[in-house]
C-alpha cells in the first residue's frame, strides 16, 4: 500500500511539472505541498484518550454526555497546532479521506480489502481500484477547495491570480459538463439533476484520480521491466 501511495504521488509530481497553464512559481509551491503530504494507512499509531467520559444507564443522558465531551474536545484545540497524527475516522470505516487542515490522506483498514485492495492481486487490479482512490484523495489537495490550503494546512493563497483564473476557466468546462445530469433511475421525475459547481471537487477527484492511476501504473511497469 505504501508503494502504491508513493507511485501515485510520483505520478502527480510529473503531471504538475507538465502543466502548460500553470506558472513556474505556482508549480513549485504545488510540488512543495505534494512533498508535505502525510499518508495514514490502516489504523492510528496513537489512540485518542476518552478519560473523563463516563456513561450510565440512561441512553439519552449518555448521548448528551458524549456530545458535550466531543464539544469540549474540539474547543480545546483552539489556539493549538493541528495534530497530524489524529485520525478523522475509525479503522472500521469503508472510505478514504483528504484533510486539508493537516494535508493528509487517510485509508482506514476497512477499505484495504477486495474489491479495493488485495496484496495478492495483480498490480493492475490494485492500481485500478485503490490506486484510483489514492489519486482521488491526493487530487482533493489541489481541487477548488483544497487548493486554498498550503502544505502545512494553513488557509493561504499560494496561487498567482493568473493561475487561479486559468484554473477556474478550465474547471468551468467540467461544471458545465455535469450541470443538469440526471441519473437514469430519476429520469422523468422533477429532479433538477446534478449541480456541477457543488460537485466540482468530487468530479475533479474522480476524473483526475483515475487518470493519474493509469500514469502511475505505467511507471510501475517501466520500473519493473513489464509490459
Model-predicted segments: where are they?
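Intrinsically disordered, low-complexity linker/terminal regions across diverse proteins
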Residues: 1-137, 141-227
Amino acid at each position: 500500500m505504501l508503494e502504491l501511495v508513493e507511485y501515485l504521488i510520483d505520478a502527480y509530481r510529473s503531471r504538475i511539472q507538465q502543466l502548460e497553464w500553470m506558472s513556474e512559481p505556482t508549480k513549485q509551491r504545488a510540488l512543495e505541498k505534494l512533498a508535505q503530504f502525510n499518508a495514514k494507512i490502516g489504523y492510528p499509531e496513537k489512540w485518542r484518550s476518552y478519560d473523563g467520559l463516563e456513561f450510565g444507564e440512561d441512553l439519552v443522558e449518555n448521548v448528551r454526555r458524549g456530545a458535550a465531551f466531543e464539544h469540549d474536545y474540539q474547543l480545546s484545540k483552539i489556539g493549538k497546532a493541528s495534530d497530524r497524527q489524529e485520525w478523522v475516522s475509525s479503522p472500521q470505516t469503508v472510505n478514504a479521506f483528504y484533510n486539508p487542515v493537516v494535508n493528509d490522506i487517510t485509508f482506514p483498514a476497512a477499505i484495504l480489502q477486495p474489491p479495493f485492495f488485495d496484496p495478492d492481486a495483480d498490480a493492475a487490479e490494485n492500481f485500478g481500484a485503490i490506486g484510483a482512490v489514492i489519486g482521488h484523495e491526493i487530487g482533493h489537495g489541489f481541487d477548488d477547495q483544497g487548493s486554498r490550503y498550503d502544505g502545512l494546512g494553513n488557509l493561504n493563497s499560494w496561487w498567482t491570480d493568473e493561475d487561479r483564473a486559468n484554473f477556474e476557466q478550465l474547471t468551468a468546462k467540467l461544471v458545465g459538463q455535469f450541470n443538469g445530469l440526471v441519473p437514469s433511475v430519476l429520469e422523468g421525475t422533477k429532479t433538477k439533476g446534478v449541480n456541477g459547481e457543488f460537485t466540482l471537487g468530487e468530479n475533479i477527484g474522480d476524473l483526475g484520480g483515475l487518470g493519474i492511476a493509469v500514469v502511475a501504473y505505467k511507471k510501475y511497469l517501466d520500473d519493473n521491466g513489464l509490459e
